[in-house]
Curated annotation (Swiss-Prot):
Substrate binds at residues 154, 178, 234. Keywords: Acyltransferase, Amino-acid biosynthesis, Cytoplasm, Methionine biosynthesis, Plasmid, Transferase. This is Homoserine O-acetyltransferase 2. It is found in: Cytoplasm. It comes from Ilyobacter polytropus (strain ATCC 51220 / DSM 2926 / LMG 16218 / CuHBu1). The gene is metAA2. It catalyses: L-homoserine + acetyl-CoA = O-acetyl-L-homoserine + CoA. Gene3D superfamilies: 3.40.50.880. Belongs to the MetA family. The keyword Electron transport does not apply. SUPFAM superfamilies: Class I glutamine amidotransferase-like (SSF52317). It is an enzyme of class 2 (transferase).
């Protein structure tokens, strides 16, 4: 079993439970399926357990993986014991899905070895969805034909965003970004999507369809405090902007984006819960 440097050798769930975060084994108010495309599975699991488990909304979480990909950094037996194949998604009775980013953004979509699985999922999905980073770029490409383009330099750091009036994010907030590619705001607007939050330096952070059913998020509100510190120590060639106090890597970075992610994920879960139970009432 592998996880990123500095992280304990525990599953994401075990690590969250050790810190007092509890999840429903079954029959939570909401059931969320997370398509985890990142190489270090346990770290991403923990990120989402920590984010989704902090509210007074009981959530059951399951993780899924594309069958056409062999993950090099996680033992196959761990995947088999803790994940469902993507082909099972429609049989799991989810209320919503989340698709993570993936370290394949510099590849053409068609050259990603699990692209057909991802493309078919996005095309057929009828559930509320959060698409994050590469997952957002993939969904925008499949659904609207929006191309991604490569940045001159990797975007790494914490950036300030402004919001356009909407029920999910408000005011100005900080959020992490870590990516080499981007979508243009012009293309997103021309597709008829809502731009909910954006940054002069980091571009569009969050967009949605007109009904707030699908969200496209270019950054990483789910990141824990140390994630960009790990990326900096790994790469060394790029310093994360607005992250370390006084740009000193020896100082503990503040969690400047915590209030933003708390607001968004609480409102998103509440929105899904409201829609779910209003649909149940309508059927009675």
């Amino acid at each position: 079993m592998c996880c990123i440097a500095g992280a304990p050798s525990l599953s994401g769930r075990e690590r969250a439970e050790k810190e007092g975060i509890r999840f429903k084994e079954n029959k939570g108010e909401l059931k969320i399926g997370i398509i985890n495309l990142m190489p270090f599975k346990e770290e991403v699991e923990y990120q989402f357990y920590a984010v989704l488990g902090r509210f007074d909304i009981s959530v059951e979480v399951e993780f899924l993986y594309p069958e056409n990909h062999v993950f090099k950094n996680t033992d196959g037996s761990y995947i088999k014991d803790n994940y469902y194949p993507l082909g099972e998604l429609n049989n799991r009775n989810y209320d919503a899905i989340i698709m993570t980013g993936a370290p394949v953004e510099l590849l053409d979509f068609q050259k990603v070895n699990y692209w057909d699985e991802i493309k078919n999922l996005i095309k057929s999905n009828k559930l509320p969805a959060l698409y994050i980073c590469w997952g957002a770029q993939a969904a925008l490409y499949v659904k609207y034909g929006i191309e991604k383009f490569t940045l001159n330099e990797k975007l790494l750091g914490i950036f300030r965003h402004r919001t356009n009036k909407n029920p999910f994010v408000s005011g100005e907030f900080w959020a992490p970004h870590s990516r080499n590619t981007q979508n243009s705001s012009k293309d997103i607007k021309n597709a008829g999507l809502r731009i909910l939050a954006e940054s002069d330096e980091a571009g569009v952070y969050m967009a949605s369809d007109r009904d707030y059913r699908e969200f496209y998020i270019s950054g990483h509100g789910e990141y824990q405090r140390e994630r960009l510190k790990y990326e900096y120590s790994r790469d060394q060639n790029l310093f994360p902007k607005n992250y370390f106090p006084e740009d000193d890597p020896k100082k503990e970075p503040p969690m400047k984006w915590d209030s933003h992610r708390k607001e968004f994920y609480y409102k998103w879960l509440s929105h899904i819960r409201e829609k779910k139970f209003s649909n149940i009432s309508d059927k009675r």
